[in-house]
Amino acid sequence: MSRGDLILTPTGLWHEHGHDGQDPVVWLDVLDLPLVYYMEASYHINGQRQDVVQGRGDRQYTRSGVVPSHVFERSRKAYPLLRYAWTDARAALESLAADDPALEHVQVTYTNPETGGDAENILGFYALMLRPGQTLRLPARSPAQVFHVIDGHVEATLVDSTFNMVEADTCCAPG
């Protein structure tokens, strides 16, 4: 896991949270904790750390439009890729911006490489790049939106409130 990566922890798949480095880390969890706490459905099990096995999907899905197929069969995994590298998303954004300089919204969607659908079946994840000095008015949407700054800085105005955000800042726009 590296800075800016999107890590999926889908419902029903065992996973652990940890940090082996010495420097501080920001972990932004985007989930339904208020509902889970209200229903008293949250629990955890203290156990041994799992062994990290390299090559469990990260490298199999590194080329756009090309997915592994073993003897003409496709994977039926709901979540074949759990880590989406920020370096790949940033490269895609920069390529998109260079390819179409007039493009107002430089945005990519994190998708399931097997199905083409959203990376997570209950949440949509996007990366949006603003050019220096750009002002962008996003359309109103019914669902709430969470914005997290990975690089640079941005001034976000939501209704009558303005937020000056820098790297690692997060804000939410209610639906």
Q: Language-model segments: which ranges?
A:
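A short hydrophobic beta-strand segment most commonly corresponding to one strand
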Residues: 8, 22-43, 147
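Short, glycine-/Ser/Thr-/acidic-enriched flexible segments
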Residues: 14, 32, 115, 143, ...
